[in-house]
């Protein structure tokens, strides 16, 4: 009888979700001496099939030192890195440390995304070292000096053979506990003699640091019923995404 009563009490509840309102998604990284490239897409509902919705009518403008350039819609893949872009301008900007650069993206739906970035200085890598254990496996140690007069944020990456492949290490950090000190990033005993490693140290803005952390949180929460939903922390206004500059030092070493 109790089982029958329990069955009678079951009800199907239909949850009505608000309609998804698509936003412009912008990703643009400035590199000194490199052409201007950007990705502009459109957000889709979580329940939609995976897709990359292009926005052909989106216009991208970048302003530096009072001069504005327009990035043309011209989708392509960078053969070196394997990354895709939707807009480009082939002439690099003459970027100096401390320069402020702005971006504006708009389309025919009257959507508008804006953002700004301040060009940072590169932080030199002082040493890339390795040491073998008794099993002939080596760990990697990368060292640099933190500036005591600034609040600094870093991204550290290592690749094997090519930056076009997935990174072996990729993490962000700040100098709250290491301000003004010599900082060293280590690894596990992952390497052997003859391995070619590409080490990259990025000096990044706090906005990019927060963006990367939020991306990591969102990946960890995706599909996990026990995780809190995670919101992407954007550096742009009016949409989703990141506009920043990449100031990095890169070294290639062969483990010997």
Predicted regions and their residues:
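Sec-dependent bacterial lipoprotein signal peptides
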Residues: 1-5
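A sequence/structural signal for flexible, mid-protein segments enriched
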Residues: 7-256
């Amino acid at each position: 009888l109790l089982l029958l009563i329990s069955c009678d009490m079951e009800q199907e509840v239909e949850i009505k979700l608000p309609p998804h309102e698509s936003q412009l998604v912008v990703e643009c990284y400035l590199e000194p001496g490199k052409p201007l490239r950007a990705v502009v897409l459109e957000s889709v509902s979580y329940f939609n099939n995976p897709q990359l919705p292009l926005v052909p009518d989106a216009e991208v403008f970048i302003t530096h030192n009072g001069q504005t350039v327009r990035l043309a819609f011209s989708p392509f893949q960078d053969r070196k890195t394997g990354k895709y872009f939707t807009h480009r301008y082939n002439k690099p900007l003459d970027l100096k440390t401390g320069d402020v650069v702005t971006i504006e993206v708009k389309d025919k739906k009257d959507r508008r995304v804006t953002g700004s970035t301040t060009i940072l200085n590169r932080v030199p890598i002082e040493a890339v070292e390795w040491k073998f254990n008794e099993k002939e496996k080596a760990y990697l140690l990368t060292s640099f000096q933190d500036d005591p007069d600034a609040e600094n944020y870093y991204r550290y990456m290592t690749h094997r053979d090519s930056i076009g492949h997935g990174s072996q290490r990729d993490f962000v950090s700040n100098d709250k506990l290491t301000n003004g000190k010599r900082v060293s990033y280590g690894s596990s005993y992952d390497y052997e003699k003859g391995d070619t490693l590409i080490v990259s140290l990025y000096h990044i803005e706090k906005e990019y640091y927060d963006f990367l952390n939020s991306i990591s949180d969102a990946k960890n929460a995706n599909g996990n019923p026990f995780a809190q939903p995670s919101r992407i922390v954007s550096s742009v206004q009016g949409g989703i995404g990141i506009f920043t500059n990449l100031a990095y030092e890169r070294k290639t070493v062969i483990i010997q």
